[in-house]
Design a protein with these regions (language model features):
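A short alpha/beta connector and helix-capping loop motif
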Residues: 18-46
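Short, well-ordered beta-to-alpha junction loops that form the rim of enzyme active sites
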Residues: 49-50, 109
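Short acidic, Gly/Ser-rich segments with clustered Asp/Glu that frequently serve as metal-coordination loops
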Residues: 12-16
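Phosphate-coordination/substrate-recognition cap region in phosphate-metabolizing enzymes
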Residues: 54
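Active-site-adjacent betaalpha module
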Residues: 3, 32, 57-184
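Short, hydrophobic/glycine-enriched beta-strand segments
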Residues: 2-8
Length: 184
């Protein structure tokens, strides 16, 4: 079975101080992917970072809340995490195992932190991983633009040396076509 992970799409990640690259496009792409995943009886999982007083994102604060631009359905699952790796000391792997999920579409924020760490963790656990190259975002960094960060990580994920070829980096349109074939 397939699942969509939507990582850290929280209000505190999307502020005037931390504008995210092409966030409207990324939000629309995530919504489109979520719609088709639901239509083929896959699972949609929101990964929500639970922070602390020092780093922010305290549970039940406004910055911790999921952004309203990403549509959430009642059957979607929220899994809480406290580290960049969505698997680390969370209920994610247990939920995936209980639901016989072996294929993950990974999206969200930030490309160079939680998205990258979760992708690499998932591959080390032998999940088949698909990354929509236009389904994750970040902000400008001190020595590199957000666009360059995203391009760089899309290239890295496409070229990782793994025992299995288990990362596919595709555009949202190609991914939707691929998922549509699973529906038939």
């Amino acid at each position: 079975m397939i699942a969509l992970l939507i990582i850290d799409m929280q209000k505190g990640m999307f502020t005037k101080e931390t504008p995210r690259y092409k966030s409207d496009l990324v939000n629309n792409n995530i919504n489109s992917i979520a719609d088709i995943i639901r239509s083929i009886n896959g699972r949609v999982i929101f990964i929500q970072h639970d922070g602390n007083k020092e780093e922010g994102y305290l549970p039940n604060t406004e910055e911790w809340e999921l952004i309203p631009e990403i549509r959430k359905n009642n059957q979607d699952r929220i899994i809480h995490k406290t580290a960049c790796d969505s698997f680390y000391k969370s209920e994610l792997e247990k939920y995936l195992t209980e639901n016989a999920i072996n294929e993950l579409v990974i999206t969200g924020c930030a490309t160079d932190y939680c998205v990258d760490t979760t992708i690499k963790s998932a591959t080390s656990k032998d999940y088949l991983v698909i990354v929509p190259n236009d389904g994750h975002t970040t902000t400008n960094r001190p020595s590199i633009s957000a666009e360059q960060v995203i391009d760089h990580y899309n290239w890295i994920w496409s070229n990782l040396i793994l025992p299995k070829k288990n990362i596919k980096v595709l555009s949202t349109n190609v991914l939707i076509d691929y998922l549509g074939k699973k529906e038939k």
